[in-house]
């Protein structure tokens, strides 16, 4: 059955709007839509594709995760794909999800419930206990290499400790600012005549997705040559390093592993905590 012209036209409008919103949110860290506005567009797109499955092509935002990788950073292919979370918007949708679970496995299993941190999703790889890679989620398969910045973020362990350290473990988590630090950062932005961040998530993304390593090299060269720009650069570098030091990390997932076997999410959290990785204390297992 062919798709009506009005449906295809609306699909194209929604795809364009959502892709632009994603670009501003994930790549430029300057969102123009509220979460509610974005969710409404996305829900309309899902409903349209459910009515006309022919529209659900690979170019649809419903078939992809996150945003494109910035050319500022080298690409990093995740060892295992990173997925995003699905949303429900009312009790009815949650009940429908429960019903699908029961239908799929025969009963409702114990569930781990956890508050979601709205931060920047990252993927960290530890090889023989040493942090060897830190990357953004990107499109779920390939992210941005921000490993150089990890050395300036005390919340990210550079080395695993305690427990039995696996040969390799890929962990996923959220980088974020506390509300208090976000308020301070926005006040600094305004005082410096810079635009404020729309929300803590975008402040965290803007802070992590900087080439501080290049700025440090440029600063050293400017100081050696006595360039006037050295003072300005020193202020930029100091601000970037200070903000990196304020970033927090909560680890909530495990990707590829070698020398580690986990069968339950709660056991995974226990293992991650034993290795010195920060996990949420806002969680509970419910039967």
Across the structure, where does each feature detected by a protein language model lie?
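RNA/tRNA-interacting regions in translation and RNA-turnover enzymes
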Residues: 1-287
């Amino acid at each position: 059955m062919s798709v009506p012209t009005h449906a295809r036209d609306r699909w194209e409008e929604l795809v364009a709007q959502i892709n632009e919103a994603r670009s501003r949110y994930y790549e430029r860290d300057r969102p123009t839509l509220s979460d509610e506005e974005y969710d409404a567009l996305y829900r309309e797109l899902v409903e349209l594709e459910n009515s006309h499955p022919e529209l659900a092509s690979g170019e649809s935002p419903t078939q992809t995760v996150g945003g494109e990788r910035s050319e500022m950073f080298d690409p990093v292919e995740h060892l295992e794909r990173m997925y995003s979370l699905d949303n429900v918007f009312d009790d009815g949708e949650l009940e429908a999800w429960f019903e699908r679970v029961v239908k799929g496995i025969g009963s409702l299993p114990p569930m781990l419930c956890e508050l979601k941190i709205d931060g920047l999703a990252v993927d960290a790889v530890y090889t023989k206990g040493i942090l060897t890679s830190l990357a953004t989620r990107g499109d779920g398969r390939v992210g941005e290499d921000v490993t150089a910045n990890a050395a300036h973020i005390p919340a990210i362990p550079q080395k695993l400790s305690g427990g039995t350290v696996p040969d390799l473990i890929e962990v996923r988590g959220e980088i974020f600012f506390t509300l208090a630090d976000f308020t301070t950062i926005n006040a600094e932005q305004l005082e410096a005549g810079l635009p404020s961040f729309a929300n803590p998530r975008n402040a965290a993304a803007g802070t992590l997705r900087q080439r501080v390593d290049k700025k440090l090299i440029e600063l050293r060269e400017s100081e050696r040559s006595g360039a006037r720009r050295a003072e300005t650069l020193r202020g930029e570098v100091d601000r970037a390093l200070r903000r990196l030091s304020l970033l927090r990390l909560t680890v909530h997932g495990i990707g590829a592993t070698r020398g580690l076997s986990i069968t339950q999410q709660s056991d995974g959290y226990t293992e991650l905590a034993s290795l010195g990785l920060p996990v949420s204390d806002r969680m509970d297992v419910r039967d």
